[in-house]
């Protein structure tokens, strides 16, 4: 059984449809090919709620050029590849709240869009004691390519969604939807749901009081 974690942030066109987009081409060989899925998905762009849902670890896709990062199919059934169930929860919240959502299109094993470029956990050589061959001994250019073709388009889309909401009214609420495994190493995670925040509790505290 997976748990669901929601992070709430309060930052200082009217039909329901989905946008699927890929990054613009650039000089040099591309990471993504014509048969690869989009880098992100925008759902319900014109949603009426003043809420943005983001799902950083929605997908377990890997660009075909990376040959599954040298991993077997079983690795992509596990939580190391994506947040199991988080995309479905995000889509359900879109329907219930009439909110906009942006979902990342590629596995956290390729690049973790929830970490800044250069962070030790951005592109990991191993995850949960499982080596990731396709992430080992990468050149600086190979790392930049993943940032350029996967990380930046996703975050640009999130920024555009925020700009649309800012232009419509007061500061929007942002919720980042994740899931977590019952165990992390040998430590139990017995909770069904978690609410996380950093310095601003204005959304998190009332949300927990109503759960």
Tell me the role of every PLM-derived stretch.
Residues 17-174, 179-211:
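N-terminal catalytic or cofactor-binding beta/alpha core of small enzyme domains
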Residues 1-20:
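N-terminal amphipathic/basic-hydrophobic helices that include classical n-h-c signal peptides
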């Amino acid at each position: 059984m997976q748990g669901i974690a929601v992070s709430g942030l309060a930052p200082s066109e009217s039909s329901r449809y989905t946008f699927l987009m890929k990054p613009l081409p650039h000089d040099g060989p591309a990471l993504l090919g014509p048969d690869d899925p989009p880098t992100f998905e925008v759902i319900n762009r014109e949603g009426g709620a003043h809420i943005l849902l983001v799902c950083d670890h929605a997908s377990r896709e890997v660009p075909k050029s990376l040959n599954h990062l040298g991993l077997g199919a079983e690795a992509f059934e596990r939580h190391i590849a994506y947040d199991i169930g988080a995309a479905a929860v995000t889509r359900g919240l879109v329907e219930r709240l009439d909110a906009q959502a942006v979902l990342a299109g590629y596995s956290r094993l390729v690049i973790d869009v929830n970490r800044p470029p250069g962070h030790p956990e951005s592109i990991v050589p191993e995850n949960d004691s499982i080596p990731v061959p396709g992430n080992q001994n990468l050149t600086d250019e190979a790392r930049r390519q993943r940032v350029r073709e996967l990380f930046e388009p996703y975050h640009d889309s999130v920024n555009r969604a925020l700009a649309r909401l800012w232009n419509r009214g007061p500061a929007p609420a942002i919720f980042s939807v994740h899931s977590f495994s019952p165990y992390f190493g040998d430590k139990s995670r017995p909770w069904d749901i978690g609410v996380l925040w950093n310095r601003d509790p204005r959304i998190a505290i009332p949300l927990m009081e109503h759960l």
